[in-house]
Amino acid sequence: MAAQRPLTIALVAGETSGDILGAGLIRALKARVPNARFVGVAGPRMQAEGCEAWYEMEELAVMGIVEVLGRLRRLLHIRADLTRRFTELKPDVFVGIDAPDFNITLEGNLKKQGIKTIHYVSPSVWAWRQKRVFKIGRSTHMVLAFLPFEKAFYDKFNVPCRFIGHTMADAMPLDPDKNAARDVLGIPHDAHCLALLPGSRGAEVEMLSADFLKTAQLLRQRYPDLEVVVPLVNAKRREQFEKIKAEVAPDLAVHLLDGMAREAMIASDAALLASGTAALECMLAKCPMVVGYRMKPFTFWLAKRLVKTEYVSLPNLLAGRELVKELLQEECEPQKLAEALLPLLANGKTSHAMHDTFRELHQQIRCNADEQAANAVLELAQ
């Protein structure tokens, strides 16, 4: 480290989740090195922790091929400018937080200039496009991984990787209070409760909502007291879901929630959800679940050929077995979904065993990730 200046850490976050991770990392580093300097591309949370923003995070938060193409010149300009400015600054460590398409090339540029680089949050290289691991290995001095099987994957290719645990596991209690969550949502303590989470993307809500609603109708026949909670990520998804519900299940009483997915999961006896981060959050909420997923036939055909893992949901990948039922494509239909959910709503042996395994997995990935990430940065800065 340079003797004449404070520890200098450069960071680039490209979206809200990265801003949250960056803020936690900065906080943990400041506790150890109070005069450290932080610069780069930052969102409001990182800036509130004292990160100097050369560019606003929104500049990078572009999704979809059309949107990316429309902004490509600007994105390439920003990356070239950051390469130049970071090379002049010579930070002790550069941390690229997620945003792999932007950050991994930037990390490679900086590594060639002798700057130590970390990629924080592994892309899903273990699942598909596995050859990306070689570019990651060339571009970074270390990957910080949320999940233990990610580290095992990098170890196979001799790419330095540290398992730091998952920040979501740190944020959620090992034993959530179901009745307190029900009080917040107005659900009676003695009722059966099912959460429906048809995804955060428009295409998911379009493909899954009708089957999820029909499943709830079937389950209501078995459990007349069944409360159905549906947390939706924003007003757009809510409007989309309401339209589908009006056509498919106009008489089905449900609690529509703006956000509040975590409360809905904690309050529920079982959840039916699309795969993705929601499945991990549901596991941490100790809510037994069934994963239902459907996509366009060609997309599914392509995914089957590209994806290298046996399971799609994180709880199953963590457990290394089918802990939760995954019903995909033509299997994702109301009768089969309802059959898989019935034993979970019964709140008997099946759901208790699932709950206990969820708790064990939670403990495995609850490692104080912010502190672990800060340790990695400081060790590399030596």
UniProtKB/Swiss-Prot annotation:
Described purpose of this protein according to its UniProt entry: Condensation of UDP-2,3-diacylglucosamine and 2,3-diacylglucosamine-1-phosphate to form lipid A disaccharide, a precursor of lipid A, a phosphorylated glycolipid that anchors the lipopolysaccharide to the outer membrane of the cell.
Any single GO CC term annotated in Swiss-Prot or TrEMBL for this entry: membrane
Family matches, as CDD domains: Glycosyltransferase_GTB-type
Biological process annotations from GO: lipid A biosynthetic process
Name of the protein in its database record: Lipid-A-disaccharide synthase
Keyword Glycosyltransferase set for record: yes
Record-listed E.C. numbers: 2.4.1.182
Source species: Salmonella paratyphi B (strain ATCC BAA-1250 / SPB7)
Pathway recorded for this protein: Glycolipid biosynthesis; lipid IV(A) biosynthesis; lipid IV(A) from (3R)-3-hydroxytetradecanoyl-[acyl-carrier-protein] and UDP-N-acetyl-alpha-D-glucosamine: step 5/6
Keywords assigned: Glycosyltransferase, Lipid A biosynthesis, Lipid biosynthesis, Lipid metabolism, Transferase
Pfam families linked to this entry: LpxB (PF02684)
GO molecular function: lipid-A-disaccharide synthase activity; phospholipid binding
SUPFAM superfamilies according to UniProt: UDP-Glycosyltransferase/glycogen phosphorylase (SSF53756)
This protein's record includes keyword Coiled coil: no
Catalytic reaction(s) noted: 2-N,3-O-bis[(3R)-3-hydroxytetradecanoyl]-alpha-D-glucosaminyl 1-phosphate + UDP-2-N,3-O-bis[(3R)-3-hydroxytetradecanoyl]-alpha-D-glucosamine = lipid A disaccharide (E. coli) + UDP + H(+); a lipid X + a UDP-2-N,3-O-bis[(3R)-3-hydroxyacyl]-alpha-D-glucosamine = a lipid A disaccharide + UDP + H(+)
Stated family: Belongs to the LpxB family.
